[in-house]
Amino acid sequence: MAHTKSKAVLILYTVCFSAFFASLSQNIYSPILPIIKESFHVSTAMVNLSVSVFMIVTAIMQIILGAIIDFKGARIVLITGILATAAASIGCAVTTDFTLFLIFRMIQAAGSAALPLIAATTIGQLFTGNERGSAMGTYQMLLSVAPAIAPVLGGFIGGAAGYEGIFWILAAISIVLLVTNSITFPKDSPTESMQQAKGNVFAHYKSIFTNRTGNVILTLSFVLFFIYFAVIVYLPILLTEHYHIDVGIAGLLYLPLALSTIAGTFLFKRIQAKIGLHTLFIGSNVIAACSIILFAVTHSVSLVLMALTLALFGISMGVIPPLYSTMITNEFEHNRGSAIGMFNFIRYTGMAAGPMVSAYLLTMMPSAMSFSLLGLGFAALSFCLLPPMFSPQKRTKQKKHHM
């Protein structure tokens, strides 16, 4: 994929805004859950199911689509995904049957799941070295902004135009993205497709799991996103039950985490070329582990101290995802789609498991002990996995796969 710098930048922002839209589609839905329940006359459990299936489908599609991208190319997956998202959004807007709504929501998840995956894969193809890290920071920054503004937009649009208004807007944006990507996104090179097709899907995933760097990043990303969502889900309970803060005001206390995450991605863009990915890898994991332990110590003592530790945690969560993504794309040049797909799948699995397992832990022991164990566990895991990752033999398997 040879492109001029201006063309590469145009493609970068097109796929990054497409990924931003995918995150928007997921997070804009939360504020209208009461409207969905009332409009379709269904139980809270059924409404929550519509949230869960979206995440489950998104996670599963990462593995499926990653392999398809490697063997068939990204453009066909991108265009098909946006078409599916547009059609499903229209279906969600017009249907009056909740079962059909659920099916359309699943199709929407399958379509939009392709967009962040293709963005990360395309960045790996268009950029190398420090430029790749900077581009990955841009990608992650837009992904970080979406969860911060999507609930606000969802509440505003849902209040003014109902849930239908949200899905009509998502459909309209999908059509704009379809046109834009059709014009700007490059056609897949036949020679690249033939080169990639020499392997098979099992060989691609085997190379990921037998690669030391891949194993370390996948393991740490699962644990980190497990902890991140355990904290996210626990916060409203802590704020309302321990500090007796109104739910509306409690939402504002997510801002330190959201804003510092955005700041962390910006920081990654600025420093990744200066200090090196391996040094940044060690430092960001140390900061993440320390901030989790500090949260365990401070969360029930002081709102101010808790906000500061959340801000520190947010900075590490802004740095680590683009860092891990960059290292994955650097490590797996010939099966990049499969590797990024597996990385995203592991992240989503951690997100889903964190709230469930942490809820059980909180019934067994005090919250301070629960989060201390999680923080110490992440620190110990990082310490144990770093030496194998930096072993000089870590690239052997990947080289064999490249042939």
Swiss-Prot record:
The keyword rRNA processing does not apply. CDD domains: MFS_YfmO_like. The keyword Transmembrane applies. InterPro entries: MFS, MFS_dom, MFS_Efflux_Transporters, MFS_trans_sf. Belongs to the major facilitator superfamily. TCR/Tet family. PANTHER family: CHLORAMPHENICOL EFFLUX PUMP RV0191 (PTHR43124:SF3), PURINE EFFLUX PUMP PBUE (PTHR43124). This is Uncharacterized MFS-type transporter YvmA. It comes from Bacillus subtilis (strain 168). The gene is yvmA.
